[in-house]
Structure formats: structure tokens, C-alpha cells
Amino acid sequence: MGAPETMRAVRIAEHGGPEVLEPAEVAVPVPQAGEVLVEVGAVALNNTDLWTREGAYGRPGDPKALSGWRGPIGFPRIQGADVAGRVVAVGAGVDGGLTGRRVVVDPAIYDGDGPDANPVGLMGSERDGGYAEYVTAPATRVHDVTESPLTDDQLATLPTAYGTALGMIERGRLTRGETVLVSGASGGVGIALIQIARARGAKVLAISSGPKIGAVRDAGAHEVLDRARDIPEQIRAAAPEGIDVVAGDLVGEVLPLLREGGRWVVAGALGGYDVTFDVRRLYLHNAQVIGSAMHTPTHFGLLMDLARRGEIQPVIAARFPLDQAAEAQEELARRGHVGKIVMRP
């Protein structure tokens, strides 16, 4: 099969607005020992793409510093964490049987080789990603999903959004019969949380607004709460016995509605990074605040099992060609959509 010598890609050479996304003709990367070369079938967009491009992650002790996910980025950088495609070449020491297989790439760069390793870097940030026709990845991080009934577009939506959601659900120890509250339910992670929590047998309450409410209900939420109305009042009506797990922001007003031993799992800062709450509601009720950055290798393996069996149905909000990456990111930033935005090289 093989690959050509050059490819189309979209890179950033500095932090800034959508205008720093530059189409380029670059050399196709060569898979090193232990790596594979993947022809990109689809790449999904994430808030991480916007924050990385803007340098919005801050640094310890300096929250306003321009920074990538885990520190300074090496420019120029090809963005894009979420890739589905086919293996077209393998590096030294890699089983040639992977060639031709349909795969999803785990974009995390881990702090170790164990099953519970933590992500300390991300494809598209700490190494080149999938805003391109081809991308390399460690062979240990590509998962064969040839048998999955999902399309490449759907598979590409899984790594960051569904990986983050599954990490939240696992770290929050959500079990069958419990009640989970999903805030920001119309986004990629929100829809993923709803679908995975439903598959787990939990009761799902979701917060959304306006025209998105119907789509969030269609995604599987048992009850959709209107952000424009009194949230605590709606929660008390929908779950008088309280909430077991909160997935997302809203801590101040929702913390008193957690059950004894309830868990609040945070995986982002879209609602702002400066949060105030009454710490007495935390310790008097044995509640927990849990930070959750993406997923572990174990979590990602569980996610790929769901994908092979087709037990989740990702929602595609829009599709763009690769050369419209700036427009695709602007669409993502407007937050008018439900589900995931994908690009097809």
C-alpha cells in the first residue's frame, strides 16, 4: 500500500486566533521503530484544539501564561488528537499484520507503560497530530476496530471526548442504579457522558438550554434540565433522593444536592477556572472532588470494546474538509452545535 512522500497538513507556528492555522505541504512522517503510519480517514475537533492554539492552559503559578496542554509547544505543530484511519506502514519491530487494519489512535502520551498510567502529553500538542493526510503513532497506542459498525467519522469522535467521559465515569465510580448529573451536556464530552452512563445503567440528568434540549434528550438523557431556569429546584424535582455523581462544573450550587459520599468529577474549566464553594458541604457529607484528565490505557481499552460492539452512537454535528480547519474551529468555538465536528482529509 505505502504512502506518498508529501502530504497536505494544517499547522500552527505560534499561539493565536484561527488565522494562525496554516495549510502546508509537508513530508509524510516516517514511522520509527515501534511506530505505525496511519492514513487519516477522519479527525475530530476538541476544545483542546482551541485551547492549544490559543495557548490557554496557563502554567503552575502563572494561570495567564501562554502554554500548551502541559507546557511550551514545539512549533510548527500539526494539531488534531482524534484520529481514525488505516495503517499503511509499520516501523521496525512492529507486527506487519497491522497493515491495512482500521484503527483508532489513543492520543495520550503517558507517564509510564502500565495499565493505569496518567496522560502527560497529547497528540496534536506534544507531538504532531491528525490535521493531515498521515500521522505516526506508537504501535501500542493503535487499536484495531476493523470489525466496528461505526464509520470513520464516528470512530474519530471517540478518543478525547469519549475517553474523557469514560475516565470521569471510572474515576467517579458510577455504578448501575446511581444518578449522575451531566452539565454542559450538548458538547462532545457531555453527549459521551450521557451515552456511557446510560450503557452503565445509571439515571442521567443533563443540563442544556434552548434548541439543544431536544437533541440532548435524543442522546439518551432521562431528564433534561433547562439552564435558563433554577437548576437546584429542577434537580430536587427530578432527583429528590439526591445526586450520586456530578460530571462537570456548577459545584457551588449543586454541592449541597450530592448524596452522602457523593462525587464531583471535574475534567475542564469551560465555566471558568476560579471556583468557590462551601467546604463544609464537602467534609460533613464525605463528598469527594475528583480531577480527571482524559483516560488511562485501561479506560481506553474499555472504550474500544464499546466501539467494536457498537454500544455507543456518536453524534456528528458537522463535517469540514481539512483545508477549512480555521472555519471548523470557529464553528466549534461558537458552541451552537450538538455532538462532534469532524474533518476529512
Question: Where are the predicted features?
Answer:
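Glycine-rich phosphate-binding loop and adjacent beta-alpha segment
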Residues: 120, 249-315, 345
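C-terminal hydrophobic helical "lid"/dimerization subdomain
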Residues: 1-5, 167, 297-345
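NAD(P)H dinucleotide-binding glycine-rich loop of Rossmann-like/cofactor-binding domains
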Residues: 69-72, 106-184
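Mid-domain Rossmann-like dinucleotide-binding core that forms the NAD(H)/NADP(H) cofactor-binding site
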Residues: 98, 150, 155-229
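Conserved "cap/hinge" positions at secondary-structure junctions
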Residues: 91, 107-108, 184, 208, ...
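Short amphipathic alpha-helix with an adjacent loop that forms part of the alpha/beta core around
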Residues: 231-240
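Glycine-rich beta-strand-centered segment in the early N-terminal region that forms part
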Residues: 27-44, 58-109, 148
